[in-house]
Protein backbone atom coordinates (compact mmCIF):
# COMPACT_ATOMS: atom_id res chain seq x y z
CA UNK A 1 0.00 0.00 0.00
CA UNK A 2 1.29 3.45 -0.92
CA UNK A 3 1.33 5.88 2.01
CA UNK A 4 2.06 9.08 0.08
CA UNK A 5 -0.24 9.62 -2.86
CA UNK A 6 0.83 12.00 -5.57
CA UNK A 7 -1.17 15.27 -5.32
CA UNK A 8 -3.66 15.87 -8.10
CA UNK A 9 -2.75 18.49 -10.74
CA UNK A 10 -3.17 22.00 -9.29
CA UNK A 11 -5.35 23.36 -12.08
CA UNK A 12 -8.83 23.28 -13.62
CA UNK A 13 -7.56 21.50 -16.70
CA UNK A 14 -9.51 18.39 -15.68
CA UNK A 15 -12.78 20.35 -16.00
CA UNK A 16 -11.89 22.09 -19.24
CA UNK A 17 -10.97 18.76 -20.82
CA UNK A 18 -14.10 16.94 -19.57
CA UNK A 19 -16.31 17.23 -22.65
CA UNK A 20 -19.34 15.66 -20.97
CA UNK A 21 -19.83 18.53 -18.49
CA UNK A 22 -22.99 20.58 -19.06
CA UNK A 23 -23.32 22.55 -15.80
CA UNK A 24 -20.43 24.01 -13.77
CA UNK A 25 -21.18 25.94 -10.57
CA UNK A 26 -18.62 28.30 -9.05
CA UNK A 27 -19.28 29.45 -5.50
CA UNK A 28 -18.03 30.23 -2.02
CA UNK A 29 -18.02 32.90 0.66
CA UNK A 30 -18.54 36.53 -0.36
CA UNK A 31 -15.46 38.54 -1.33
CA UNK A 32 -13.20 35.66 -2.38
CA UNK A 33 -13.19 36.42 -6.11
CA UNK A 34 -15.84 33.99 -7.38
CA UNK A 35 -16.73 36.17 -10.36
CA UNK A 36 -13.14 36.52 -11.55
CA UNK A 37 -12.70 32.75 -11.27
CA UNK A 38 -15.98 31.85 -12.99
CA UNK A 39 -15.35 34.36 -15.79
CA UNK A 40 -11.82 33.01 -16.26
CA UNK A 41 -13.13 29.44 -16.38
CA UNK A 42 -15.72 30.44 -18.99
CA UNK A 43 -12.96 32.03 -21.10
CA UNK A 44 -10.91 28.82 -21.01
CA UNK A 45 -13.96 26.71 -21.84
CA UNK A 46 -14.70 28.96 -24.83
CA UNK A 47 -11.39 27.81 -26.33
CA UNK A 48 -12.50 24.18 -26.52
CA UNK A 49 -16.32 24.25 -26.56
CA UNK A 50 -18.67 25.26 -29.34
CA UNK A 51 -20.70 27.67 -27.18
CA UNK A 52 -20.41 28.73 -23.54
CA UNK A 53 -22.87 30.64 -21.34
CA UNK A 54 -21.99 32.22 -18.01
CA UNK A 55 -24.97 33.07 -15.78
CA UNK A 56 -24.76 35.32 -12.74
CA UNK A 57 -27.28 34.41 -10.04
CA UNK A 58 -25.78 36.94 -7.62
CA UNK A 59 -27.97 40.07 -7.25
CA UNK A 60 -24.73 42.10 -7.24
CA UNK A 61 -24.20 41.04 -10.88
CA UNK A 62 -20.44 41.37 -10.93
CA UNK A 63 -19.89 39.76 -14.32
CA UNK A 64 -20.88 43.05 -15.96
CA UNK A 65 -18.06 44.69 -14.00
CA UNK A 66 -15.65 41.83 -14.70
CA UNK A 67 -16.06 42.01 -18.47
CA UNK A 68 -16.67 45.78 -18.41
CA UNK A 69 -19.87 45.24 -20.39
CA UNK A 70 -23.54 45.54 -19.44
CA UNK A 71 -25.43 42.23 -19.41
CA UNK A 72 -29.16 41.61 -18.98
CA UNK A 73 -31.52 38.68 -18.39
CA UNK A 74 -31.12 37.71 -22.05
CA UNK A 75 -27.91 35.89 -23.16
CA UNK A 76 -25.58 38.46 -24.75
CA UNK A 77 -22.36 37.81 -26.64
CA UNK A 78 -19.29 38.91 -24.67
CA UNK A 79 -17.14 41.48 -26.47
CA UNK A 80 -14.05 39.92 -28.01
CA UNK A 81 -15.55 36.42 -28.23
CA UNK A 82 -17.54 34.57 -30.87
CA UNK A 83 -18.88 31.76 -28.70
CA UNK A 84 -19.04 33.16 -25.14
CA UNK A 85 -22.33 34.58 -23.87
CA UNK A 86 -23.39 36.05 -20.52
CA UNK A 87 -26.65 36.79 -18.72
CA UNK A 88 -27.69 37.98 -15.26
CA UNK A 89 -30.75 36.90 -13.32
CA UNK A 90 -32.08 37.96 -9.94
CA UNK A 91 -33.63 34.90 -8.26
CA UNK A 92 -35.40 37.15 -5.76
CA UNK A 93 -37.48 38.60 -8.58
CA UNK A 94 -39.24 35.29 -9.25
CA UNK A 95 -41.00 34.93 -12.59
CA UNK A 96 -40.93 38.70 -13.09
CA UNK A 97 -37.25 38.30 -14.00
CA UNK A 98 -38.10 36.43 -17.20
CA UNK A 99 -38.32 38.14 -20.59
CA UNK A 100 -41.89 39.16 -21.40
CA UNK A 101 -41.59 37.43 -24.77
CA UNK A 102 -41.60 34.09 -22.97
CA UNK A 103 -45.21 34.59 -21.94
CA UNK A 104 -46.47 36.02 -25.23
CA UNK A 105 -48.57 33.96 -27.59
CA UNK A 106 -51.29 34.07 -30.19
CA UNK A 107 -54.05 34.32 -27.63
CA UNK A 108 -54.67 35.79 -24.22
CA UNK A 109 -53.94 32.51 -22.40
CA UNK A 110 -50.16 32.76 -22.48
CA UNK A 111 -50.15 36.36 -21.32
CA UNK A 112 -52.55 35.66 -18.47
CA UNK A 113 -50.70 32.54 -17.37
CA UNK A 114 -47.72 34.48 -16.04
CA UNK A 115 -49.84 36.27 -13.46
CA UNK A 116 -51.85 33.17 -12.63
CA UNK A 117 -48.70 31.08 -12.28
CA UNK A 118 -47.13 33.71 -10.00
CA UNK A 119 -50.20 33.71 -7.74
CA UNK A 120 -50.29 29.92 -7.59
CA UNK A 121 -46.63 29.48 -6.69
CA UNK A 122 -46.83 32.22 -4.06
CA UNK A 123 -49.08 29.82 -2.16
CA UNK A 124 -46.17 27.36 -1.88
CA UNK A 125 -43.53 28.65 0.59
CA UNK A 126 -39.97 28.75 -0.74
CA UNK A 127 -40.84 27.87 -4.31
CA UNK A 128 -40.78 31.35 -5.89
CA UNK A 129 -36.98 31.58 -6.05
CA UNK A 130 -36.77 27.97 -7.21
CA UNK A 131 -39.31 28.62 -9.97
CA UNK A 132 -37.27 31.52 -11.33
CA UNK A 133 -34.30 29.16 -11.59
CA UNK A 134 -36.55 26.57 -13.19
CA UNK A 135 -37.78 28.91 -15.89
CA UNK A 136 -34.26 30.10 -16.63
CA UNK A 137 -33.11 26.49 -16.92
CA UNK A 138 -35.97 25.80 -19.32
CA UNK A 139 -34.92 28.73 -21.49
CA UNK A 140 -31.21 27.86 -21.33
CA UNK A 141 -31.75 24.22 -22.21
CA UNK A 142 -33.70 25.30 -25.27
CA UNK A 143 -30.71 27.34 -26.47
CA UNK A 144 -28.41 24.28 -26.51
CA UNK A 145 -25.22 25.80 -25.10
CA UNK A 146 -22.36 23.30 -24.90
CA UNK A 147 -21.71 24.17 -21.26
CA UNK A 148 -23.17 26.61 -18.72
CA UNK A 149 -21.09 28.22 -15.94
CA UNK A 150 -22.93 29.61 -12.91
CA UNK A 151 -21.40 32.53 -11.04
CA UNK A 152 -23.36 32.01 -7.85
CA UNK A 153 -24.29 34.24 -4.93
CA UNK A 154 -22.72 33.62 -1.48
CA UNK A 155 -23.15 30.17 0.03
CA UNK A 156 -26.76 30.30 1.33
CA UNK A 157 -28.19 31.28 -2.06
CA UNK A 158 -25.93 28.75 -3.76
CA UNK A 159 -27.31 25.86 -1.75
CA UNK A 160 -30.85 26.91 -2.65
CA UNK A 161 -29.85 27.07 -6.31
CA UNK A 162 -28.45 23.55 -6.13
CA UNK A 163 -31.59 22.26 -4.40
CA UNK A 164 -34.11 24.02 -6.65
CA UNK A 165 -34.91 21.02 -8.88
CA UNK A 166 -36.16 19.00 -5.89
CA UNK A 167 -38.15 21.99 -4.59
CA UNK A 168 -39.76 22.59 -7.98
CA UNK A 169 -40.49 18.92 -8.59
CA UNK A 170 -42.23 18.71 -5.23
CA UNK A 171 -44.14 21.98 -5.70
CA UNK A 172 -45.20 21.33 -9.28
CA UNK A 173 -46.20 17.82 -8.35
CA UNK A 174 -48.66 19.28 -5.84
CA UNK A 175 -50.01 21.76 -8.39
CA UNK A 176 -50.47 19.13 -11.06
CA UNK A 177 -52.27 16.81 -8.65
CA UNK A 178 -54.68 19.67 -7.95
CA UNK A 179 -55.08 20.80 -11.54
CA UNK A 180 -58.25 18.79 -12.16
CA UNK A 181 -59.88 20.60 -9.24
CA UNK A 182 -58.39 24.00 -10.04
CA UNK A 183 -59.01 24.09 -13.79
CA UNK A 184 -62.85 24.32 -13.62
CA UNK A 185 -62.61 27.14 -11.07
CA UNK A 186 -60.15 29.06 -13.23
CA UNK A 187 -62.34 28.56 -16.28
CA UNK A 188 -65.32 30.05 -14.43
CA UNK A 189 -63.17 32.91 -13.16
CA UNK A 190 -61.81 33.96 -16.57
CA UNK A 191 -65.30 33.65 -18.07
CA UNK A 192 -66.60 36.11 -15.48
CA UNK A 193 -63.86 38.52 -16.60
CA UNK A 194 -65.06 38.26 -20.19
CA UNK A 195 -62.01 36.33 -21.43
CA UNK A 196 -63.83 33.43 -23.04
CA UNK A 197 -60.94 32.66 -25.40
CA UNK A 198 -58.58 31.81 -22.52
CA UNK A 199 -57.76 28.11 -22.40
CA UNK A 200 -56.79 27.10 -18.87
CA UNK A 201 -55.20 23.96 -20.30
CA UNK A 202 -52.39 26.24 -21.51
CA UNK A 203 -51.33 26.87 -17.92
CA UNK A 204 -51.49 23.18 -17.16
CA UNK A 205 -49.39 22.41 -20.23
CA UNK A 206 -46.78 24.96 -19.14
CA UNK A 207 -46.52 23.27 -15.75
CA UNK A 208 -46.25 19.85 -17.38
CA UNK A 209 -43.50 21.06 -19.72
CA UNK A 210 -41.59 22.70 -16.90
CA UNK A 211 -41.80 19.63 -14.67
CA UNK A 212 -40.43 17.47 -17.47
CA UNK A 213 -37.45 19.79 -18.00
CA UNK A 214 -36.73 20.15 -14.29
CA UNK A 215 -36.87 16.40 -13.75
CA UNK A 216 -34.24 16.08 -16.46
CA UNK A 217 -32.13 18.88 -14.93
CA UNK A 218 -32.39 17.23 -11.51
CA UNK A 219 -31.00 13.99 -12.95
CA UNK A 220 -28.18 15.88 -14.68
CA UNK A 221 -27.24 17.82 -11.52
CA UNK A 222 -26.60 14.54 -9.71
CA UNK A 223 -24.59 13.07 -12.56
CA UNK A 224 -20.85 13.79 -12.06
CA UNK A 225 -20.29 13.36 -15.79
CA UNK A 226 -22.55 16.36 -16.46
CA UNK A 227 -22.38 18.58 -13.36
CA UNK A 228 -19.65 19.68 -10.98
CA UNK A 229 -19.02 22.42 -8.43
CA UNK A 230 -15.89 24.54 -8.03
CA UNK A 231 -15.35 25.99 -4.54
CA UNK A 232 -13.50 29.31 -4.31
CA UNK A 233 -11.91 30.39 -1.03
CA UNK A 234 -9.05 32.40 0.42
CA UNK A 235 -6.45 31.20 2.95
CA UNK A 236 -8.30 32.43 6.04
CA UNK A 237 -10.20 30.67 8.82
CA UNK A 238 -13.75 31.80 8.03
CA UNK A 239 -13.38 31.15 4.31
CA UNK A 240 -11.98 27.67 4.92
CA UNK A 241 -14.76 26.93 7.42
CA UNK A 242 -17.40 28.05 4.91
CA UNK A 243 -15.80 25.94 2.19
CA UNK A 244 -15.92 22.81 4.33
CA UNK A 245 -19.58 23.46 5.16
CA UNK A 246 -20.36 23.99 1.48
CA UNK A 247 -18.61 20.77 0.45
CA UNK A 248 -20.52 18.80 3.08
CA UNK A 249 -23.84 20.23 1.89
CA UNK A 250 -23.00 19.55 -1.75
CA UNK A 251 -22.12 15.97 -0.88
CA UNK A 252 -25.49 15.58 0.89
CA UNK A 253 -27.22 16.88 -2.25
CA UNK A 254 -25.33 14.39 -4.41
CA UNK A 255 -23.43 17.12 -6.29
CA UNK A 256 -19.92 16.32 -7.53
CA UNK A 257 -17.14 18.54 -6.17
CA UNK A 258 -13.43 17.85 -6.61
CA UNK A 259 -11.96 21.27 -7.45
CA UNK A 260 -11.00 24.05 -5.03
CA UNK A 261 -9.54 27.42 -5.97
CA UNK A 262 -7.53 29.22 -3.28
CA UNK A 263 -7.53 32.82 -4.45
CA UNK A 264 -5.69 36.03 -3.50
CA UNK A 265 -2.49 34.33 -2.35
CA UNK A 266 0.62 36.35 -1.57
CA UNK A 267 3.72 34.93 -3.25
CA UNK A 268 6.81 36.35 -1.52
CA UNK A 269 9.72 37.71 -3.53
CA UNK A 270 12.73 39.94 -2.85
CA UNK A 271 10.61 43.09 -2.85
CA UNK A 272 8.71 41.80 0.19
CA UNK A 273 11.83 41.08 2.29
CA UNK A 274 11.48 44.24 4.41
CA UNK A 275 7.66 44.11 4.67
CA UNK A 276 6.66 42.77 8.09
CA UNK A 277 2.97 42.69 7.19
CA UNK A 278 3.73 40.67 4.04
CA UNK A 279 5.77 38.17 6.05
CA UNK A 280 3.01 37.87 8.65
CA UNK A 281 0.35 37.46 5.98
CA UNK A 282 2.43 34.82 4.21
CA UNK A 283 2.87 32.86 7.46
CA UNK A 284 -0.89 32.86 8.11
CA UNK A 285 -1.80 31.74 4.60
CA UNK A 286 0.80 28.93 4.69
CA UNK A 287 -0.87 27.61 7.85
CA UNK A 288 -4.25 27.38 6.10
CA UNK A 289 -2.74 26.03 2.87
CA UNK A 290 -1.30 23.17 4.92
CA UNK A 291 -4.77 22.51 6.36
CA UNK A 292 -6.29 22.56 2.88
CA UNK A 293 -3.66 20.09 1.68
CA UNK A 294 -4.51 17.74 4.57
CA UNK A 295 -8.29 18.06 4.27
CA UNK A 296 -8.57 17.88 0.50
CA UNK A 297 -5.79 15.58 -0.66
CA UNK A 298 -8.19 14.02 -3.21
CA UNK A 299 -9.11 17.44 -4.70
CA UNK A 300 -7.54 19.51 -7.43
CA UNK A 301 -6.40 22.61 -5.49
CA UNK A 302 -5.61 25.58 -7.74
CA UNK A 303 -3.65 28.48 -6.21
CA UNK A 304 -4.17 31.95 -7.65
CA UNK A 305 -2.16 35.11 -6.86
CA UNK A 306 -3.14 38.37 -5.22
CA UNK A 307 -2.51 40.94 -7.93
CA UNK A 308 -1.54 44.60 -7.71
CA UNK A 309 -4.32 45.56 -10.12
CA UNK A 310 -7.90 44.34 -10.37
CA UNK A 311 -8.82 41.90 -13.12
CA UNK A 312 -11.30 43.77 -15.29
CA UNK A 313 -12.07 43.67 -18.98
CA UNK A 314 -11.85 40.81 -21.52
CA UNK A 315 -8.09 41.12 -22.03
CA UNK A 316 -7.32 41.05 -18.30
CA UNK A 317 -9.58 38.05 -17.78
CA UNK A 318 -7.99 36.21 -20.71
CA UNK A 319 -4.53 36.77 -19.22
CA UNK A 320 -5.59 35.82 -15.69
CA UNK A 321 -7.44 32.72 -16.90
CA UNK A 322 -4.14 31.11 -17.90
CA UNK A 323 -3.46 30.63 -14.18
CA UNK A 324 -6.35 28.15 -14.07
CA UNK A 325 -4.58 25.91 -16.56
CA UNK A 326 -0.93 26.29 -15.52
CA UNK A 327 0.07 26.74 -11.86
CA UNK A 328 1.11 30.33 -11.15
CA UNK A 329 4.88 30.81 -11.06
CA UNK A 330 5.93 34.15 -9.48
CA UNK A 331 9.51 33.69 -10.71
CA UNK A 332 8.37 33.39 -14.31
CA UNK A 333 6.15 36.46 -13.93
CA UNK A 334 8.98 38.53 -12.47
CA UNK A 335 11.10 37.86 -15.57
CA UNK A 336 8.43 39.17 -17.95
UniProtKB/Swiss-Prot annotation:
Locations listed in the record: Cytoplasm; Endoplasmic reticulum
Active-site residues, as the UniProt record annotates them: 58
Any one Gene Ontology BP term: tail-anchored membrane protein insertion into ER membrane
E.C. number: 3.6.-.-
Pfam families, A to Z: ArsA_ATPase
Protein origin, superkingdom: Eukaryota
Residues binding ATP: 29-36, 236, 263
Matching NCBIfam families: GET3_arsA_TRC40
Subunit text: Homodimer.
Protein name in UniProt: ATPase ASNA1 homolog
The organism's taxonomic lineage, starting at the top: Eukaryota, Metazoa, Ecdysozoa, Arthropoda, Hexapoda
